[in-house]
Amino acid sequence: NGHKLDEASQAMSKLQIKIRSLRDISPSISVVEPQGEDCAHVARSKIMQVLHLVEHKLNGNWLMVEDSGLFVDALGGFPGVYSSYVHSTVGIEGIVKLLEGKEDTSASYISSIAFWDGERIHSVQGHCKGRISPESRGDAGFGYDPIFIPEEGDGRTFSEMNLREKTSLSHRTMALKKMVEKLNFPSI
C-alpha cells in the first residue's frame, strides 16, 4: 500500500532510514491475506509467508510487515481486521450509517508490525484513539481517514491534516516507534 509506505517513510526519515516496498525486492511476490482474530496475527502470518521467499534477497536489511484496522467501539470493534474489505464494499459511508443515532462514536486505529531483524521475528503494536465524524471531511489520506478524528488532535480528521501532522499522531507511527526501540535505534 503506497499510502502506508509514505507514512512509514515520513516517520522514519528522521533516522535516515529508507523504507522500501517489498515489490522493490521481489516484484512478483504474492501474499495471501490471512484471516485472523487480530491485526498482530495477520501481520505475523504475512511476514512468515514473505520471509522464506525473500530472506536470501535482504542482504542484511530487516523486513517489516504492517497490518492495521479501524475498531469502532459501538460496533463491537467492527470493522477491525476486516477494515480493508469493509472499506471496499460499504465504504466510509457504510460505517457512518451504522453509527447513525448512536451517542458513542469512539474508535481506535490499531497498527501491528511484525519485523525480522535478521535473526528473529518481533511484533509491536501502536494505537490511536479517536472518534468517528458524522460526515466525511478532508481530501488527504486514505481508507477511513476522512471520518477519523484523533483524540490527541485539534478536531480535524486525518484527511484534513497534511502527512507530517497525521504521521505525528498516527497508530502506524506509534508502532514504528516501538519497533525502533526494539532495534535499539535512536527515537523517532
Give the role of each language-model region.
Residues 2-188:
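Anionic-ligand binding patches
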